[in-house]
Amino acid sequence: MLAGLLTWSLFEYVMHRYLFHLALPTEWGRRFVFLMHGNHHDDPDDPWRSIMPPIVSVTWSGAIWAAMAWALGGAGTVLFLGFILGYVVYDAVHFACHRLPVRGRLMRMLRRHHLRHHHGREEGNYAITAMFWDHVFGTYLSAKKAAGSAPRADA
């Protein structure tokens, strides 16, 4: 299960950095990225844009579980349980960052980290639940760094 949580956290970072902020050359491609994630940046406080629609989550989850089970057998299902737990935690944390009063030092840190991505520079702070990935990949934005430039208009 722990391996599944770690796998989720890396998946979350990679998807957010490379897929959700992908700059595609065609109008169709830009529209696809906008519908997938850009609309969340247009209105980050809209509760309907803070979590994935269930049909998308269920479809992706089924495909990921099938791949893990095929590759690892029964261990793949255990890995997937940790992965899906990570996803549920991610959705709850992400929703709370935008919509709920947060309590506790960790939640305040996660909120601050994520909101720098929205209100500072979109080129950093891609991790929502595991900020260490931004440090590992050099995309961490401190308050000073995030305030040092305007948000991108194309994401």
Language-model features: locations:
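Membrane-embedded catalytic scaffold of the fatty acid hydroxylase/desaturase
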Residues: 12, 17-155
